[in-house]
């Protein structure tokens, strides 16, 4: 009996040592992570924050997003699997004072595994009194293809909508970590963070954009990575990519891309 007690005491002490050692290792790992975050520059933090979504690019089949989960926080209701919002828009000025803006928004609901949205066509005027002309054409995604739900008599526009591809479907940011010497802007009060890079026309993403869109300027674009909200992640804020080819008046040319994961709206999912 005395022998059994000694064995039990030995095992208790051993487990206690392992537990304390484990806690020590966990604390060491936490300290290492905290130290890494402290030593990372804001530029590195911005790139790491974007990498959480950009590492998924190219998303050739958008329906794969039904099986992917983004950043979750207390804004999500119990049982809500979340919704991905994806947007690609292209704006170009062909004459001073007017900006032609077209693109698509799609909401991919992971609860229902349904994706609906719209294609938008808009003219943005310097004279804001004229800015009431946006047209929206309802669409849905089926078998990774855009299906037009509204009647569109313009055959050219109809074809453009049905063949539309989001930037995230062909963009590749595998070398994002190699982007260097960005122009960094931060506002901790908002909070917001921005990294801007001068790209080269030989960049594969830039070349692809020139193939798809009527980009007439030969200027190499600036790439802007913009975060609104907590740099570590937030379902309230958002992240946006922007390629600006020209800022000249009457020649403004911009591609913007947005992929965000957030709570599903208007549903009882509990």
Swiss-Prot record:
Keywords of the record: Cell membrane, Lipoprotein, Membrane, Palmitate, Signal
Residues with lipidation of kind S-diacylglycerol cysteine: 23
Gene3D superfamilies documented for this protein: 2.50.20.40
CC annotations in GO: plasma membrane
Any coiled-coil regions, as ranges: none
UniProt keyword annotation of Transport present: no
Protein localization: Cell membrane
Signal peptide start and end residues: 1-22
Any matching Pfam family: DUF576
Membrane topology recorded in Swiss-Prot or TrEMBL: Lipid-anchor
Lipid moiety-binding region (N-palmitoyl cysteine): 23
Record family assignment: Belongs to the staphylococcal tandem lipoprotein family.
NCBIfam families linked to this entry: SA_tandem_lipo
Name of the protein in question: Uncharacterized lipoprotein SAOUHSC_00405
Source organism (scientific name): Staphylococcus aureus (strain NCTC 8325 / PS 47)
Upper classification of the organism: Bacteria, Bacillati, Bacillota, Bacilli, Bacillales
């Amino acid at each position: 009996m005395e022998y059994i007690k000694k064995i039990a005491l030995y095992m208790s002490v051993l487990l206690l040592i392992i537990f304390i050692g484990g806690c020590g290792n966990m604390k060491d790992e936490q300290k290492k992570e905290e130290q890494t975050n402290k030593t990372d520059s804001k530029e590195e933090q911005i790139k790491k924050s974007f990498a959480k979504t950009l590492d998924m690019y190219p998303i050739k089949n958008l329906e794969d997003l039904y099986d992917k989960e983004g950043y979750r926080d207390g804004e999500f209701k119990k049982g809500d699997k979340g919704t991905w919002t994806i947007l690609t828009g292209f704006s170009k000025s062909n004459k001073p004072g007017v900006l032609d803006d077209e693109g698509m928004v799609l909401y991919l609901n992971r609860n229902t595994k349904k994706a609906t949205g719209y294609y938008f066509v808009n003219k943005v005027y310097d004279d804001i009194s004229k800015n009431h002309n946006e047209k929206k054409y309802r669409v849905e995604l089926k078998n990774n293809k855009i299906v037009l739900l509204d009647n569109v008599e313009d055959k050219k526009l109809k074809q453009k909508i049905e063949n539309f591809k989001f930037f995230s479907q062909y963009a590749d940011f595998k070398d994002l970590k190699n982007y260097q010497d960005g122009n960094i802007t931060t506002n901790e009060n908002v909070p917001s963070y921005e990294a801007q890079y001068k790209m080269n026309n030989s960049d594969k993403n830039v070349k692809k954009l020139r193939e798809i869109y009527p980009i007439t300027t030969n200027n190499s674009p600036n790439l802007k990575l913009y975060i609104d909200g907590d740099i570590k992640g937030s379902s309230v804020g958002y992240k946006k990519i922007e390629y600006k080819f020209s800022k000249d008046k009457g020649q403004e040319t911009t591609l913007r891309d947005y992929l965000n994961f957030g709570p599903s709206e208007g549903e009882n999912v509990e």
